[in-house]
Amino acid sequence: MADKDKKVKKKKAKEDAPAEEAPAAAAPAGDRQSSRGSRKAKRTGSNVFSMFSQKQVAEFKEAFQLMDHDKDGIIGKNDLRATFDSLGRLASEKELDEMVGEASGPINFTQLLTLFANRMSGGSDEDDVVINAFKTFDEEGKIDSERLRHALMTWGDKFSADEVDEAYDQMDIDDKGYIDTTKLIAMLTASAEEEEGGEAA
């Protein structure tokens, strides 16, 4: 009977040992790999945040929240369409597809920052940033002054009505309420250059 007990114990130990050893050996390797991958992903995300000031990140966050119409934490094609609609501009399916296609995956907040960082590191200078910002409002070389006023008083560093009025006093606005885009950009970029020149002196 003792021999039988020994055989059963030996058999049981033999069956249990490989089953316990295999997962134990496989688990740490899998854990190490996934934790390394997640740490790398976290580092990549945090590198994007370090490219911007806290104020800029807060402004991007505000813009992201305004664009995320369905509040699911991801900007999709419908969110982009609704954003353009709220600006009074119709975006074609092709434009929307191209915008969504620029991202390497779903556009969450970190992905949005990454897209901006890629654009900014792509050699865009301040003038290009200004020009691209006004393309959203540009209607064949003109900007509707009321739409621009609304945007200036609603998004980002919100301007007061007095501040917008003061800026509009310096702009050339036609009888129909349109601002010449080229003149506006020239005025803004010249003002920025004057400020930089004044700081250097």
UniProtKB/Swiss-Prot annotation:
InterPro entries hit by this protein: EF-hand-dom_pair (IPR011992), EF_Hand_1_Ca_BS (IPR018247), EF_hand_dom (IPR002048), Myosin_RLC (IPR050403)
GO CC list: myosin complex
Chain positions with Phosphoserine modification: S46
Extent of Low complexity compositional bias: 20-29
Residues at which Ca(2+) binds: D68, D70, D72, D79
Ranges for domain EF-hand: 55-90, 125-158, 159-194
Domain of life where this protein originates: Eukaryota
Database matches in Pfam families: EF-hand_6 (PF13405)
Keyword Membrane carried by entry: no
Residue numbers spanned by region Disordered: 1-48
Molecular functions per Gene Ontology: calcium ion binding
Record's subunit section: Myosin is a hexamer of 2 heavy chains and 4 light chains.
PANTHER family per UniProt: MYOSIN REGULATORY LIGHT CHAIN 2
Protein's UniProt name: Myosin regulatory light chain 2
Organism: Bombyx mori (Silk moth)
